[in-house]
Every structure is written in structure tokens, then in C-alpha cells.
From Swiss-Prot:
Gene: greA
Source species: Francisella tularensis subsp. holarctica (strain LVS)
The family this protein is said to belong to: Belongs to the GreA/GreB family.
GO biological process: DNA-templated transcription elongation; regulation of DNA-templated transcription elongation
Function, as annotated: Necessary for efficient RNA polymerase transcription elongation past template-encoded arresting sites. The arresting sites in DNA have the property of trapping a certain fraction of elongating RNA polymerases that pass through, resulting in locked ternary complexes. Cleavage of the nascent transcript by cleavage factors such as GreA or GreB allows the resumption of elongation from the new 3'terminus. GreA releases sequences of 2 to 3 nucleotides.
Family matches, as InterPro entries: GreA/GreB_C_sf, TF_GreA/GreB_CS, Tscrpt_elong_fac_GreA, Tscrpt_elong_fac_GreA/B, Tscrpt_elong_fac_GreA/B_C, Tscrpt_elong_fac_GreA/B_fam, Tscrpt_elong_fac_GreA/B_N, Tscrpt_elong_fac_GreA/B_N_sf
Pfam families membership: GreA_GreB, GreA_GreB_N
Residues in coiled coil: none
Designated name of the protein: Transcription elongation factor GreA
């Protein structure tokens, strides 16, 4: 599975590239400087600043490798360039209505690393997203939730 392509929106790719750029151009040089400065303080065995800086360096280098791996495996999908004809696909913004409460909620279906429920972005592998994929406006889906079965109607499908 390590070589499988992972779907990602253009915004998700841009965010990862920005983070990678910051890590490489700002964080990495700053930590190298902090390590050099801590080294100048003498005995490394009891030098807390040195050990903290080395630990931080490991975290930064690990994150850089993680982002580079994600970007190399990313399949960037720009939903605005796909003719989906009203069908829910990866990258679509979907408004659903709970048929019992008539409460409407809008979600964007994104890659796993982009998911952010506070900003109404759900992972393509989430149960709700999986149920919505390939459905169309007017269709209904039923999900098993901890509170029992919930039925939603797809109110709108947008590609933005």
C-alpha cells in the first residue's frame, strides 16, 4: 500500500508544500543554529538545551520525510476540471439534510490528510463520504451511527 496513489485536493497539496517549504527554509536552519549554540555551552552529557534541540531536529526531519512521502504518492485531483454531472465524487462539496430533523450540513470530501471536521472537510474514507460517493442530488443514504440509523438526503452537489 505504500506505493498506492493517495487522492488530494489542490489546496491540500498547496498546504503541504507550504509546510515543507517552512520546515526546510526556516525551522531546519533555526534548529541547526540552536544545536551549534547549545554545543558551545560545553559538556553535552548534561546539556538540556542541546538534547532538546536534537530532539526537535529529529521531529522536524521526520515531518519533512513524511510530507515528501505524501507528496510523492499524491494524486492531485482538481474537481473543477472534472465533468461529474451532479454525481458526488472526491473533492465535491455536498449539502445533506437529516430527513428526521431537517438539519442541513455541508461537507467537502477530501484526502485523509486534509480532513478537518471543524471546517466541514471529511476524509474520502470516512463512512459518510463512502456512502455519498457516486450518489446524486435527491438521493438518500442511510448510515448506522452510535445513536441508530440516520437517513440523509443529498440537497446539493457542488464542484468548487
Amino acid at each position: 500500500m505504500a506505493n498506492d496513489r493517495v487522492p488530494m485536493t489542490p489546496a491540500g497539496e498547496q498546504a503541504l508544500r507550504a509546510e515543507l517549504d517552512k520546515l526546510k527554509k526556516i525551522e531546519r536552519p533555526a534548529i541547526i543554529e540552536a544545536i551549534a549554540e547549545a554545543r558551545d555551552h560545553g559538556d553535552l552529557k548534561e546539556n538540556a538545551e542541546y538534547h532538546a534541540a536534537r530532539e526537535r531536529q529529529g521531529i522536524i526531519e521526520g515531518r519533512i520525510k513524511d510530507i515528501e512521502s505524501k507528496l510523492s504518492n499524491a494524486q492531485v485531483i482538481d474537481v473543477t476540471k472534472i465533468q461529474a454531472n451532479g454525481m458526488v465524487i472526491f473533492g465535491a462539496t455536498v449539502t445533506i439534510m437529516n430527513v428526521d430533523t431537517e438539519e442541513e450540513t455541508t461537507y467537502k470530501i477530501v484526502g485523509e490528510d486534509e480532513a478537518d471536521i471543524d471546517n466541514q472537510k471529511i476524509s474520502v474514507v470516512a463512512p459518510l463520504a463512502r456512502a455519498l460517493i457516486k450518489k446524486e442530488e435527491g438521493d438518500e443514504i442511510t448510515l448506522d451511527t452510535p445513536k441508530g440509523k440516520v437517513t440523509y438526503e443529498i440537497v446539493a452537489v457542488e464542484y468548487k
